[in-house]
Amino acid sequence: MRYLDDFEIGQRFDLGSFSLTAEDIIGFAKRYDPQAFHLTDDPDGPFGGLIASAWQTGSECQALLVKSFLNHAASLGSPGVERLRFLKPVRADTVYQASFLIMEVVPSQKRPDRGRILGRLELRDPDATLVYSLDGLMIFARR
């Protein structure tokens, strides 16, 4: 179990990877984001084919963050997101790699049993190009 006191600025955690099938993308889109470029593989469309909803990308990243990081830490939730960027489309049958970078570690002045970190969740394609980035605040218990 990791606590606030165990984190240092600059630490990076590998969260694992994911890949979506065309069926995954279309199924999510039908339910949550039914825009044409999430529903059909149209080479003449604005993205040159089928792409995942940015919200599906975020959901996949969140799942990796929870399974590989938050479930092994004294997480007390999140007060919010500072910055969110959808930089490149996520496509079917491509493996994407996620990581989490610690950017700030701040013990609470008012509640000494906890503190916050600012972390960056990143998703990269097979060429290591950044496709998704989220800077979020998280609260962690202290030892």
Where do the protein language model's features map onto the residues?
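HotDog/MaoC-like acyl-thioester-processing domains
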Residues: 1-9, 86, 90-95, 99-143
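Hot-dog-fold acyl-thioester-processing enzymes
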Residues: 1-80
